[in-house]
Amino acid sequence: MLSSGLGENVSLNLNQGFFNGKVVVADNSVLAPFVDSGYDWLLYQIAGQVLVAPSVIDPNPAMKAEFNRYIGKAPEKIAQRRRDYLGKSGQLWVQAQLSPTELVYVEKYREKYKEHLEGKDGDLETLAIAKVRQGIILTNDKGLIFAAGKEDVQCFYPCQLLVLAVQWSLIPCCDAEHLYNDIFVRELKLFSKKRLYCKYQVPTCV
């Protein structure tokens, strides 16, 4: 099983379709770079239809979920991409409805991981959903990855997703390198010390 440590350079050797049939829960730190860059289609090709916590995204633009809140502040091109993504509810993504058990887990994790997830309702919901439904989390959030590791929940972060995209021939290696280093990190300010490099067309996160 893939390690959930954010700081580790993990070699990915997963068959295409790895995510098929699995519960894949995405948080805002993954949705934002893929959607804002215009690559929401690539996220879908990699992971399929993702499940998203209600505090992270809502199909109603007026709601104040994490993803929605930036629409009013973003440059128009990015704002329109986010509005378009909201309209793809039921296709590219589905909003999760938390069960009573998951709500109990949210409160349990709120106390247990107070140091790492305080004030992060979206991350708490994401962790609870993935734990109860035996799912996988897509995130770039270090605190969430720490908590998920403690709960034996598998995580993938954006650089790893792009490595898989190259391995599965969804995108050329040079395009993935540019997308991650120049667009995600430099332009969209994704917080990451990692960079994606292509050596002999082999992608690596270092």
Model segments located where?
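Active-site-proximal, substrate-binding regions of enzyme catalytic domains
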Residues: 2-135, 142, 160-163, 177-184, ...
